[in-house]
Amino acid sequence: MTLHLGSHVSMNGKKMLLGSSEEAISYGANTFMVYTGAPQNTRRKPIEELNIEAGRAHMKENGIDHIIVHAPYIINIGNSEKPATFKLGVDFLQSEIERTQALGADQIVLHPGAHVGAGVDKGIEKIIEGLNEVLTENDGVQIALETMAGKGSECGRTFEEIARIINGVTHNDRLSVCFDTCHTHDAGYNIVEDFDGVLNEFDKIIGVERIKVLHINDSKNPRGAAKDRHENIGFGHIGFKALHYIVHHPQLQDIPKILETPYVGEDKKNKKPPYKFEIDMIRNGTFHEGLLEKIVAQ
């Protein structure tokens, strides 16, 4: 079994997908995740400018056969208050799915949505409506609903909420789940001392076979804080031992694991990516106390 381990990488400039693949390889990764453009706006390059052919060739040369796309966080199909926001979310999600397919990825990770004060039931109802508009039966891409921390009015912070969304969608064979360790911890699940119990609960409520992506992040906050602030691997409230256990869990073996941990350094203009060091540490199974200093010194 191959451990598919990588991180979020950038996709910009002239190189686009080729640059993403080169960045991933520089970290010692064999998978990666990208946004197809800035996550906070709808400006996107046309598909023919994503440099897909060169990017795919570089991936193939370096043994990367699986990549993930993350939908931008401006998409909110849980908004029942503003029809324009909902419509933008549906339309933009549809075009992002086309871009995901063009890149050769089969998973696009989506934050389910926020109810913006209308209540969870209303939010879930709207998310189902949006997904039913977007998902037709003939498309190869799955939308991976991300487990959320429960910050603000986020929907999808419990397994039950995600199950309700999945069960409400007609073509729900096109839905999968992205299990985020920081989010589930912050939502109150005890993944530190009882990950097997949490996974069993997930299996009963949703089905473990739905998990197609894992976001591996430590957390700056104690369990149940509903905050969603990622921390570097081993330096937060989840800790290295628990995260290493999750990454190497026999039930999650072939699933891509993606790090979204923060860049390191005091100088805001010159923070350094931690991924090469964290990937190496996870593969070797030994925690390095002095890792952050090492990252800054690179």
Curated annotation (Swiss-Prot):
It is an enzyme of class 3 (hydrolase). Zn(2+) 2 binds at E146, D180, H215, E260. It catalyses: Endonucleolytic cleavage to 5'-phosphooligonucleotide end-products. GO terms for biological process: base-excision repair. InterPro entries: AP_endonuc_2, AP_endonuc_F2_Zn_BS, Xyl_isomerase-like_sf, Xyl_isomerase-like_TIM-brl. Binds 3 Zn(2+) ions. Zn(2+) 1 binds at H70, H111, E146. Endonuclease IV plays a role in DNA repair. It cleaves phosphodiester bonds at apurinic or apyrimidinic (AP) sites, generating a 3'-hydroxyl group and a 5'-terminal sugar phosphate. Belongs to the AP endonuclease 2 family. This is Probable endonuclease 4. Zn(2+) 3 binds at H183, D228, H230.
